[in-house]
Amino acid sequence: MYKRLFISHVILIFALILVISTPNVLAESQPDPKPDELHKSSKFTGLMENMKVLYDDNHVSAINVKSIDQFLYFDLIYSIKDTKLGNYDNVRVEFKNKDLADKYKDKYVDVFGANYYYQCYFSKKTNDINSHQTDKRKTCMYGGVTEHNGNQLDKYRSITVRVFEDGKNLLSFDVQTNKKKVTAQELDYLTRHYLVKNKKLYEFNNSPYETGYIKFIENENSFWYDMMPAPGDKFDQSKYLMMYNDNKMVDSKDVKIEVYLTTKKK
């Protein structure tokens, strides 16, 4: 009897370890934020333009690519060219841990996400690829990677975004993806891109909204990202985008998206 009990405990421990260590990060439950948990745009005195550019027309996007190098054990480097502005031809993708990097190393993947340049570091080996233009030919991002094979839809799938302004559902619109499993980062980018264009979510100096967060709901689980910068006079793009480093994914057929905004009091 004791032997069977011991074996059962061992099996349970290994099962828990497997769950904790698995690199496939899907939606996990997170309580809705309390008002005092959210950043307030009125407390940010820097340029909101530095947030806006993360969700404007320029982002990293590549289909069916494979990593060419690795700087640190938790990142991968891809040969991806900026076809719009010509600002980079190599992209460093940083993950939360080694397991995630190993999961996608040497596999064909799709990459989509917001990128930054300041404090973007590459290995000397990758820098040498670009010789004298090293500082101008690279960019960095966090997560945003999905396996290419077996993850494509025959046609784009629409996901409805419901926008609540001061508690009222004043707007709904669709974002689209052709992926079965899609990163929250990709859907977040598409949502904010729409709101920047149509609701002036971020302007040059500030925002017409005091607080905002985007919420992803999948079955009974939900999680959210704060849409405003932290208090202060400077905005660190790298630090802000780090929230995507777990490469969190959702199922495009099940996920629901809600945005909660509060306007500034006049």
Swiss-Prot record:
Residues 1-27 form the signal peptide. It is found in: Secreted. It comes from the Bacteria. Keywords: Disulfide bond, Enterotoxin, Metal-binding, Secreted, Signal, Superantigen, Toxin, Virulence. One of its GO terms (cellular component) is extracellular region. SUPFAM superfamilies: Bacterial enterotoxins, Superantigen toxins, C-terminal domain. InterPro entries: Enterotoxin (IPR008992), Staph/Strept_toxin_CS (IPR006126), Staph_tox_OB (IPR006173), SuperAg_toxin_C (IPR016091), Superantigen_bac (IPR013307), Toxin_b-grasp_Staph/Strep (IPR006123), Toxin_bac (IPR006177). Disulfide bonds join 120-140. Coiled coil: none annotated. The keyword Metal-binding applies. GO terms for molecular function: metal ion binding; toxin activity. Pfam families: Stap_Strp_tox_C, Stap_Strp_toxin. Interacts with MHC class II molecules composed of alpha/HLA-DRA and beta/HLA-DRB1 chains. Interacts with T-cell receptor beta variable 19/TRBV19. Lacks the zinc-binding site found in other members of this family, such as staphylococcal enterotoxin A, C2 and D, thus it possesses only one MHC class II binding site. Belongs to the staphylococcal/streptococcal toxin family. Staphylococcal enterotoxin that activates the host immune system by binding as unprocessed molecules to major histocompatibility (MHC) complex class II and T-cell receptor (TCR) molecules. In turn, this ternary complex activates a large number of T-lymphocytes initiating a systemic release of pro-inflammatory cytokines. Also causes the intoxication staphylococcal food poisoning syndrome. This is Enterotoxin type B.
